């Protein structure tokens, strides 16, 4: 047990403490009576309470040299108050009492006190503090009750009796019932006389429980029943009384102290107006700007009332002050209040010490507490920090506190209970963790201290009200000190909260999951081959001196776009003598080789060097296409955040993105307004050149994207998708086809013409013919050619394009080039160096960049497709480079890995069945899906056609045949189309014409409601990929922003004892070390993972996904299913009001939950029929546990 504080045993002249005639007493404000003094004949005190108030009392008791005794329920056996006492005893035995009932077991508590030689019992507040019978039992047992006499508690603890007392003393009261009210009919009679609004209050007890404001007849009966039920549960007595409810009053209370000789003093007032559900949230002492005459009348009336009943010990007289500064007596609380701390701070008086010493027989004068000696100095403000979630109606949160760091410093006082790391917060008790009291010489200084202290707290593992308190304390009305009792309910902007980011703990949750379960990144095979620090290259100038790359280069082709616009840019590109390079390393290269898995942190790490080395590049292909959804889906990154960061780091090179025409970056057509919205935001965020294509070369589809980019004022690079072999007269797509297509595209006024050879089947001789023919027809039109090096002829083809008149060609850094990626930039530069087509890049700088990527590729080795060389067979199967590696992975996942050759052949078959279509995302996916379908079902081409009416084709195949991807050149294949679609529609125009515009404002509101905030970029992401976006946001809510985590630790756990760093933002670094992974808990299926964070040990509980446990947890309500009703909080079901099959209306009560002394009605979210009721009265539930379903009528 905690050892009490002991003063040195020294000779003391007791007379100096008890002789109230000594002159020096008049010069002393507050004396302490030691336990061995003539008055303090008592040695041991028991506190009949829990949480922070016993700790507060124990501290003073130790200062008075008293021995201390704590009591606790079984559920409270790990609570801090038990450890702060010299002795601690459990109330009864396990299961004998409910968690709250244990602290209401008066006989058992008295029995414990007698058994262990207790002399004084302090009741604290709540529980038995206002129970006169308990006080009588204490005194009857020969002990001293630290509080008023039982008779006083009877007369004042009953608010109706206190009201009658006020009337006799000519103290103004609010109109209300003359006596206790037990029946609904009595309440109804009062409203018939006085009207609404009214307030129903528990006659015994406080803290806002058993209290309801009723504003209309419809809510009267239910409010009466809830108030009486809460009062009975909290105080053991359901009696209530009724008063007229005052609108926007202030709540002012006066701290009183009385002794056994009829002396009463006040310790001035507190302003407790800031309340929620009649529970005080923030208190101020003294009241700011209360008129002096009003203050004097309130203080005088408070003392008058106390003296009229010979009040003994500490108590509080409470008043309401209306907007005309008229005051009305409410009640006297015959106990110490939660907020007594602020009075102590401004008066310097220890109220608890005074309580104990008065109970021992001291007079106020002996304690130096005469009214003329009591004054205030400065201001004090108290906040109650609770485990409540303000964003969910302040529903109490439960769980384990993982991190607890307190505030401190000058003028900060903390009175805590169960606020410590490792504490288990249960639904059984009050949700308060700690009281934070700050004092200052002025109200504003005190307010600023509280705000600072709140920001200083770090509490993780449970939700807290700290963000709300910070918002409240910063509101102009609070700053002015003009709050009223319903200020919180009346001020919705208080709930525009900026919550704590909780970044470290969320990051630990992810790292812990990787430590226990390994990486969950789809497509990852094993751990990285490279685990060292990547060495960044140095760029040298012509004299061999290192370039300063601490800042990015600011000179490049982008400056022409920014300063002169897209048209001038196009003219400048066309006028340029050399053939420019677009570097694809940041997008298509890693898409083709590493499954699009390269993360933002690794791009930014080489960004400044890239801006210098490639300053004369046509563009960096770095965004759009598959990188957009993969960023959210697999890397858990925001693609817009990536774009913003890249743009800042590389301000000089134009950024190019891939736009799938009317699809945006999605896989099927979207309403036109979604495309326009997307392009507008992409341009705003940093994209310069939009390479717009349509997967079927459908010009109607392509036109949507082109017009959207024009509207966004971006550079339009309208693109022809190259497929087949134009030199083969048997092939579908010949030179005439491409030239006719180019004519249609040029009519749409693009700035640049793109040629997209997605499979790498553009042979050098075909390249010369195609590019040369276009150049001849359109001599002023810039041409940019994109290819893949799958067949190994990419370098030759790109050189051929340059020689035929192309203005820009694609390449990738050497170590990320070849095979399904783009041709080698080093090889192209070497081939064109010194010629009229020289790209104008520094080869040494380009090679230096490549040294970084050579290391990085090893870091991403788990995503390699293990291709070993060129595949000229691509001229037969025509699988796009970006799809080939993904198709290999998909085949292995489907169990077709051993049939890869067969899958490639099936790709040719599928392409022919679909009409030899242009193959690029999303149509390439259609062909790939059909190929795998053919292999897995062992079908021939004829089987597919003959059995089309009965086969369950992949969804992408049906969408293509339906026309949702546009119209293919030459039409759809028949009879396959009609047979496969059966009764589905057939579109003969572009799909966007059949789609209603998206309600973008509604989407934004939906995102805001679901995730707390929403930007236009969020709307754009949702429009493209609703489910992917929602899943990503939920992941981030759980694990935070993982883009800051070094890739090695994103993909694999560190070694035990290995230290590594994570830079959360500039100047904020976490120093982490994995310490241990605990054993599997058979009860929970979890393992504890221990990390050291900035030298502090933290732990997280992680579900072991490999463990087989008996999961008896209740099913959770699916928030996406409106028919499912979940519990709004953890608690106990105290009442069920429905049954299966019952028809209910929206808002009808379904059940009542009780948690932390608060009851909450679960209401029907909509009308319908109840089914699947899963709870019964007495059941314990957690937040979001499924209660029932309501099927809409």
Curated annotation (Swiss-Prot):
Main location: cytoplasm
Biological process, per Gene Ontology: gluconeogenesis
Pathway: Carbohydrate biosynthesis; gluconeogenesis
Residue positions where N6-biotinyllysine is found in the record: 1157
Subcellular location: Cytoplasm
Residues given in the record as a divalent metal cation binding sites: 588, 756, 786, 788
Disulfide bond residue pairs: none
Protein name: Pyruvate carboxylase
Keyword Heme: no
Known function: Pyruvate carboxylase catalyzes a 2-step reaction, involving the ATP-dependent carboxylation of the covalently attached biotin in the first step and the transfer of the carboxyl group to pyruvate in the second.
Residue numbers carrying N6-carboxylysine: 756
Catalysed reactions listed for this entry: hydrogencarbonate + pyruvate + ATP = oxaloacetate + ADP + phosphate + H(+)
EC annotation from Swiss-Prot or TrEMBL: 6.4.1.1
């Amino acid at each position: 047990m905690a050892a009490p504080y002991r003063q040195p045993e020294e000779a003391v002249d007791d007379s100096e403490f008890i002789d109230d005639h000594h002159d020096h007493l008049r010069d002393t404000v507050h004396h302490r009576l030691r336990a061995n003094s003539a008055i303090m004949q008592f040695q041991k005190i028991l506190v009949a309470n829990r949480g922070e108030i016993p700790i507060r009392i124990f501290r003073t008791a130790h200062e008075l040299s008293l021995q201390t005794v704590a009591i606790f329920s079984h559920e409270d056996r790990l609570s801090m108050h038990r450890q702060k006492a010299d002795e601690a005893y459990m109330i009864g035995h396990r299961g004998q009492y409910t968690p709250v009932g244990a602290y209401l077991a008066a006989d058992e508590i008295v029995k414990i006190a007698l058994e262990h030689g207790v002399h004084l019992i302090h009741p604290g507040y709540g529980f038995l503090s206002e129970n006169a019978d308990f006080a009588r039992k204490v005194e009857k047992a020969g002990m001293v009750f630290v509080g008023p006499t039982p008779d006083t508690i009877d007369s004042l603890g009953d608010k109706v009796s206190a009201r009658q007392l006020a009337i006799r003393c000519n103290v103004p009261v609010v109109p209300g019932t003359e006596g206790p009210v037990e029946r609904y009919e009595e309440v109804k009679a009062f409203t018939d006389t006085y009207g609404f609004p009214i307030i129903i209050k528990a006659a015994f007890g406080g803290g806002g429980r058993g209290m309801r404001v009723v504003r209309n007849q419809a809510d009267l009966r239910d409010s009466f029943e809830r108030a009486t039920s809460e009062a009975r549960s909290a105080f053991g007595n359901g009696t209530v009384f009724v008063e007229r409810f005052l609108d926007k009053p202030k709540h002012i209370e006066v701290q009183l102290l009385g002794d056994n000789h009829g002396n009463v003093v006040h310790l001035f007032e507190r302003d407790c107006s800031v309340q929620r559900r009649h529970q005080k949230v923030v208190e101020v002492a003294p009241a700011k700007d209360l008129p002096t005459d009003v203050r004097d009348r309130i203080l005088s009336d408070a003392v008058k009332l106390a003296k009229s009943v010979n009040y003994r010990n500490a108590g509080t007289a409470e008043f309401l002050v209306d907007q005309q500064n008229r005051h009305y007596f409410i009640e006297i609380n015959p106990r110490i209040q939660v907020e007594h701390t602020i009075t102590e701070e401004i008066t310097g008086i220890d109220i608890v010490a005074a309580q104990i010493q008065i109970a021992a027989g001291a007079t106020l004068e002996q304690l130096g507490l005469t009214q003329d000696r009591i004054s205030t100095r400065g201001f004090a403000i108290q906040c109650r920090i609770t485990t409540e979630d303000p964003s969910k109606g302040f529903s109490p949160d439960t769980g384990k506190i993982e991190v607890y760091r307190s505030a401190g410093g000058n003028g900060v006082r903390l009175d805590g209970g169960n606020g410590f790391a490792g504490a288990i917060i249960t639904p059984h008790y009050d949700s308060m963790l700690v009281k934070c009291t700050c004092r200052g010489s002025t109200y504003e200084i005190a307010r600023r201290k509280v705000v600072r202290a709140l920001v200083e707290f770090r509490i993780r593992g449970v939700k807290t009200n700290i963000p709300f308190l910070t918002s409240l304390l910063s509101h102009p009305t609070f700053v002015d000190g003009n709050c009223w009792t319903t200020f919180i309910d009346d001020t919705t902007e208080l709930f525009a909260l900026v919550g704590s980011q909780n970044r470290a703990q969320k990051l630990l949750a992810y790292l812990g999951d990787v430590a226990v379960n390994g990486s969950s990144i789809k497509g990852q095979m094993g751990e990285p081959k490279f685990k060292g620090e990547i060495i960044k290259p140095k760029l040298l100038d012509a004299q061999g001196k290192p370039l300063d790359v601490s800042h990015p280069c600011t000179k490049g082709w982008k400056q022409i776009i920014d300063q002169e616009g897209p048209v001038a840019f196009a003219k400048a590109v066309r006028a340029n003598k050399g053939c420019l390079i677009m570097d694809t390393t940041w997008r298509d290269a890693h898409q083709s080789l590493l499954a699009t898995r390269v993360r933002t942190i690794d791009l930014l790490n080489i960004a400044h060097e890239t801006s210098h080395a490639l300053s004369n590049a046509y563009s960096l292909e770095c965004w759009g296409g598959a990188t957009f959804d993969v960023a959210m889906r697999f890397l858990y990154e925001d693609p817009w955040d990536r774009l913003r960061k890249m743009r800042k780091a590389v301000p000089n090179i134009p950024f190019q993105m891939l736009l799938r025409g009317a699809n945006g970056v999605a896989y099927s057509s979207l309403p036109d307004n979604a495309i326009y919205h997307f392009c507008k935001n992409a341009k705003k965020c940093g994209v310069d050149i939009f390479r717009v294509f349509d997967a079927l070369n459908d010009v109607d589809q392509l036109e949507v994207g082109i017009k959207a980019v024009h509207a966004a004022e971006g550079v339009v690079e309208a693109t022809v998708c190259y497929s087949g072999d134009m030199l083969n007269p048997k092939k579908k797509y010949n030179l005439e086809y491409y030239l006719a297509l180019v004519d249609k595209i040029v009519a749409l006024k693009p700035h640049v013409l793109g040629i997209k050879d997605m499979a790498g089947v553009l042979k050098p001789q075909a390249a010369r013919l195609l590019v040369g023919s276009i150049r001849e027809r359109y001599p002023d039109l810039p041409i940019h050619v994109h290819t893949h090096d799958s067949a190994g002829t990419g370098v030759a083809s790109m050189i051929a394009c340059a020689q035929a008149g192309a203005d820009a060609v694609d390449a990738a850094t050497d170590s990320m080039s070849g095979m399904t990626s783009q041709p080698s930039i080093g090889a192209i530069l070497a081939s064109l160096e010194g010629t009229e087509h020289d790209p104008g890049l520094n080869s040494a700088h380009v090679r230096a960049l490549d040294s970084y990527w050579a290391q990085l590729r090893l870091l991403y080795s788990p995503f390699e497709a293990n291709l070993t060389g060129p595949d000229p067979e691509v001229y037969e199967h025509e699988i796009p480079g970006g799809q080939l590696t993904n198709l290999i992975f998909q085949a292995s996942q489907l169990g077709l890995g051993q049939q890869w050759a067969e899958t490639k052949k099936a790709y040719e078959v599928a392409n022919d069945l679909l009409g030899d279509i242009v193959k690029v995302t999303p149509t390439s996916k259609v062909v790939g899906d059909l190929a795998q379908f053919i292999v897995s079902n062992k079908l021939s081409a004829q089987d597919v056609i003959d059995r089309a009416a009965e086969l369950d084709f992949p969804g992408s195949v049906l969408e293509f045949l339906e026309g949702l991807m546009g119209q293919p050149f030459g039409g759809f294949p028949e009879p396959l189309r009609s047979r496969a679609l059966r009764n589905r529609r057939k579109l003969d125009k572009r799909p966007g014409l059949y789609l209603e515009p998206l309600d973008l404002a509604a989407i934004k509101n939906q995102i805001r409601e679901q995730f707390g905030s929403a930007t236009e970029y969020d709307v754009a992401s949702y429009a493209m990929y609703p489910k992917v976006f929602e899943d990503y946001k939920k992941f981030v809510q759980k694990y935070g922003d993982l883009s800051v985590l070094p890739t090695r630790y994103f993909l694999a756990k560190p070694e035990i004892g290995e230290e590594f760093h994570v830079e959360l933002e500039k100047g904020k670094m976490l120093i982490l070390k994995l310490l241990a992974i605990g054993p599997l808990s058979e009860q929970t299926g979890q393992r504890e993972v221990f990390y050291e964070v900035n030298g502090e040990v933290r732990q997280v509980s992680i579900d072991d996904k490999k463990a087989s446990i008996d999961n008896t947890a209740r099913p959770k309500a699916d928030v996406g299913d409106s028919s499912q009703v979940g519990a709004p909080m953890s608690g106990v079901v105290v009442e069920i009001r429905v049954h299966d099959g019952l028809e209910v209306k929206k808002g009808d009560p379904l059940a009542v939950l009780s948690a932390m002394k608060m009851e909450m009605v679960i209401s029907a979210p909509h009308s319908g029929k109840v089914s699947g009721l899963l709870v019964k009265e007495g059941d314990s539930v957690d937040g979001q546990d499924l209660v029932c379903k309501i099927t809409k009528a």
